[in-house]
Design a protein with these regions (language model features):
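Nucleotide/phosphate-binding sheet-loop regions of phosphoryl- and nucleotidyl-transfer enzymes
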Residues: 1-257
Length: 257
């Protein structure tokens, strides 16, 4: 396949909004300036449109490019998806040409599985952080990729808090987070009649497809109509090393406009 559908952040620049989306173009621009942007890559808006042309399927050529750029990300970061010794975790985010805040989908902590959670707990010496990240990933992936009810996951959390006699999520300890992981997986299996995916590359492709699909979810369609944004633009997808906001009291994440 001659057409380029995937760009490392340092390959693009801020003028390429039509192809890389607003987020991807700005990440590229900041990378070019030498700012400390966590490594990642952008799957273009053209890949999104091709996905719809191919009956909502990511074709083999685009998949091959995604895997090629994942390999580059792993080499740059020194981490690998699913690695038992030094695992890579990524975020998968939408990025349309025009800002559409909250309209499309995001998946965080992708790459988590049973083995990786144990490794992260050991590497950080922080079991609570590791299993909190894992349960958040299961919850988000189940909702965004598989369409399960967000409400039921929140109810499960409330049930565990009630059993423990606490009211704040911050008071849930590492053992509570481990219990939530198992309860979330059980709900997933009961609803979908299959196990939660352990293979990080399967997780990644599922998440990318979900972001492409979110371009045409009802709230995104409504937002585009209200703001005169053409449906033909499509959305880019940004895959980037995770930055954690839940590792402790000395870290956080936010959005600046």
């Amino acid at each position: 396949m001659d057409k380029k559908y995937v760009y490392e952040f340092n390959e693009g620049d801020e003028t390429m909004r039509e192809l890389l989306g607003g987020k991807g173009a700005n990440l590229a621009g900041m990378s070019k300036l030498g700012m400390p942007v966590p490594y990642g890559f952008t799957i273009t808006t053209e890949a999104c449109n091709q996905y719809y042309e191919d009956n909502e399927t990511i074709n083999d050529g685009i998949k091959a490019q995604i895997m090629e750029y994942l390999d580059l990300l792993e080499k740059k970061s020194g981490k690998r998806l699913g690695d038992e010794a030094n695992p890579l975790l990524v975020s998968v985010r939408s990025g349309a040409r025009a800002s559409m805040p909250g309209m499309m989908d995001t998946i965080l902590n992708l790459g988590m599985n049973k083995t990786v959670a144990e490794t992260v707990a050991n590497l950080t010496n922080n079991e609570r952080f590791a299993y909190d990240s894992y349960r958040r990933f299961i919850q988000m992936y189940s909702d965004v990729v598989m369409g399960l009810s967000k409400k039921r996951f929140e109810e499960i959390i409330d049930e565990v808090k009630a059993e423990r006699g606490i009211s704040d999520d911050l008071d849930l300890n590492a053992e509570d987070m481990k219990e939530l992981v198992e309860l979330f997986k059980a709900f997933y299996k009961n609803e979908l009649k299959s196990e939660f995916p352990e293979d990080p590359k399967e997780q990644l492709m599922g998440a990318i497809e979900a972001v492409f699909r979110s371009w045409n979810n009802p709230r995104a369609i409504y937002y585009r109509k209200m703001n005169d944004i053409p449906s033909s633009w499509g959305t880019a997808v940004n895959v980037q090393m995770m930055v954690f906001g839940n590792m402790g009291n000395d870290c956080g994440t936010g959005v600046a406009f």
